[in-house]
């Protein structure tokens, strides 16, 4: 499970998710990628579930790059607690993903296997995704 080693502040503001991703919009390391077409928070558990779905389908073949990291903490108050009395306790970690960001990359497998592996991974994520290929140089 991906979590930061240490953070400066345990509780963060939620922030705004406006516009497109600034960087990481092209396939950089692998041959094929999974690009977000909507913006959302992706938890460390969802990233791990997507990684497992991809690697199980690829059966020890190829290489996977995870290009997002859950660095932002989110908080939640206990069930049945009334409003007020401060911010809730840290609940988990999320990676804010804006539209256009390539989240996962694959190399070393055929296009059919990569397409199916990334399709299986996309079902584990709360964003709409599309399959992208590396640009010819």
Curated annotation (Swiss-Prot):
Gene Ontology CC entries for this record: cytosolic large ribosomal subunit
GO molecular function terms here? rRNA binding; structural constituent of ribosome; tRNA binding
List GO BP terms, alphabetically: response to antibiotic; translation
Q: Which Pfam families match?
A: Ribosomal_L16
Q: Which UniProt keywords are listed?
A: Antibiotic resistance, Ribonucleoprotein, Ribosomal protein, RNA-binding, rRNA-binding, tRNA-binding
The subunit field of the Swiss-Prot or TrEMBL record says: Part of the 50S ribosomal subunit.
Task: Indicate the family of this protein.
Answer: Belongs to the universal ribosomal protein uL16 family.
Q: Which HAMAP family match?
A: Ribosomal_uL16
Function summary? Binds 23S rRNA and is also seen to make contacts with the A and possibly P site tRNAs.
User: What protein am I looking at?
Assistant: Large ribosomal subunit protein uL16
UniProt source species: Streptococcus pneumoniae serotype 4 (strain ATCC BAA-334 / TIGR4)
